[in-house]
């Protein structure tokens, strides 16, 4: 069979390492793409490149996914200001940007064949497949799903498959399944999957309470039209801001939680997650919005935001409704300009100061203190504002009498 080009989303792990010889034996010339979304250091990037070469790929490409994940997801998530089911901040949404990198490479090679290493048991397969299908007429090959039709112990099968072909398997035993990127870390497996208390080993960036600094941390974040642009007065790119906030707030244990929720495929999922930088950004942005948006904006916007979050979580990243909702979210940010001061003493973060020319206040008015209207005006407002409830009570009280 003549070789056909196929582009594989590659991470260097067991699953995607297995995919390379498997696809080659199906007659494909395998081209790998590693989209670095912030979860590896330089040594790991080097390992991934060498691993791809060792396994015999036709070409390998490493893509800096930081700018894409900021512009394509983080900005919109912060505008939305919501988490999935009120808690989980969508930490594996880098999958959509990985798909974009894979499809760009496929288009450059003139092929419609793409592959990923997702299993047939989780959410990621849905996100990968829907994101691919939404962007063109591509052929999706998912080798791990294929072998699950015949093998129950797939990882053991993959390991044996590689060893039989002379490829080593990385001796890196992990008690947990870990996903790490610029957004944060998720951990599952072990006692987490057994609905038990996570052990101390189930920890990524966030320091335990015993290691928190004794002095409080104060950080100022500047926003322009809802986008963070500077930290403590220093302009930074989006990815730089998130990296800096991750480091600062992780040392105080901020952004760590245990989440149980409804997965795309209908099962209950349980993870430990850590998102120190995102937690800080969301806290600061929400405090600024509270001060500068109108009452009606602050009431209505969460409805839009929750739907946007649901679409992203469930794989509908390219659905037209998501684009429609983002148009509203972006419009709502026109006056979200200012600087928020955050403070943490460990475990949680609070917005302690707000500076903005758009704060909706009046020189002559301070809530519950002073006002530039008279007593009669206040009484008249209360009478009209509560008219419906007052009439209801009056009418029905008369009927009962």
UniProtKB/Swiss-Prot annotation:
Catalytic activity: L-citrulline + L-aspartate + ATP = 2-(N(omega)-L-arginino)succinate + AMP + diphosphate + H(+)
Gene Ontology cellular component list: cytoplasm
One Pfam family cited in the UniProt record for this chain: Arginosuc_synth
Residues that, per the record, bind ATP: 9-17, 35, 117
PROSITE patterns referenced in this protein's UniProt entry, alphabetically: ARGININOSUCCIN_SYN_1, ARGININOSUCCIN_SYN_2
Localization per Swiss-Prot or TrEMBL: Cytoplasm
Pathway in which this enzyme or protein is active: Amino-acid biosynthesis; L-arginine biosynthesis; L-arginine from L-ornithine and carbamoyl phosphate: step 2/3
Annotated L-citrulline binding sites: 88, 93, 123, 127, 273
CDD domains tied to this protein: ASS
Domain of life: Bacteria
Quaternary structure (record): Homotetramer.
Protein name stated in the entry: Argininosuccinate synthase
Protein species of origin: Xylella fastidiosa (strain Temecula1 / ATCC 700964)
Top-level taxonomy: Bacteria, Pseudomonadati, Pseudomonadota, Gammaproteobacteria, Lysobacterales
Gene: argG
């Amino acid at each position: 069979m003549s070789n056909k080009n196929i582009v594989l989303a590659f991470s260097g792990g067991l699953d995607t390492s297995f995919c390379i010889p498997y696809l080659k034996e199906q007659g494909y010339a395998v081209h790998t793409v590693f989209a670095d979304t912030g979860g590896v250091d330089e040594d790991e990037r080097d390992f991934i490149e060498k691993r791809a070469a060792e396994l015999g790929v036709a070409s390998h490409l490493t893509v800096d996914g930081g700018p894409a994940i900021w512009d394509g997801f983080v900005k919109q998530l912060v505008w939305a200001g919501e988490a999935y089911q009120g808690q989980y901040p969508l930490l594996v949404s880098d999958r959509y940007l990985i798909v974009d990198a894979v499809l760009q490479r496929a288009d450059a090679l003139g092929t419609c064949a793409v592959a990923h290493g997702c299993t047939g048991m989780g959410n990621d397969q849905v996100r990968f497949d829907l994101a691919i299908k939404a962007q063109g007429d591509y052929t999706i090959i998912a080798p791990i799903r294929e072998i699950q039709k015949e093998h129950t112990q797939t990882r053991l099968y993959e390991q044996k498959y590689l060893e039989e072909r002379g490829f080593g398997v990385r001796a890196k035993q992990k008690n947990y399944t870990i996903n790490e990127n610029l957004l944060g870390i998720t951990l599952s497996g072990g006692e987490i999957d057994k609905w038990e208390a996570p052990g101390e080993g189930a920890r990524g960036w966030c320091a335990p309470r015993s290691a928190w600094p004794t002095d409080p941390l104060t950080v100022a974040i500047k926003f322009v039209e809802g986008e963070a642009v500077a930290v403590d007065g220093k302009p930074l790119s989006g990815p730089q801001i998130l990296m800096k906030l991750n480091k600062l707030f992780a040392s105080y244990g901020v952004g760590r939680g245990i989440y149980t929720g409804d997965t795309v495929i209908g099962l209950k999922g349980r993870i430990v997650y850590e998102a120190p930088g995102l937690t800080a950004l969301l806290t600061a942005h929400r405090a600024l919005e509270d001060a500068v948006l109108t009452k009606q904006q602050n009431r209505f916007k969460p409805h839009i935001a929750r739907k946007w979050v649901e679409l992203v979580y469930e794989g509908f990243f390219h659905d037209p409704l998501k684009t429609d909702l983002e148009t509203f979210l972006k419009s709502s940010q026109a006056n979200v300009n200012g600087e928020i001061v955050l403070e943490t003493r460990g475990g949680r973060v609070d917005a302690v100061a707000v500076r903005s020319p758009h704060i909706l206040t009046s020189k002559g008015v301070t809530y519950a203190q002073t006002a530039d209207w008279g007593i009669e005006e206040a009484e008249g407002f209360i009478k009209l504002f509560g008219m419906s409830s007052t009439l209801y009570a009056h009418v029905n009280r008369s009927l009962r009498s």
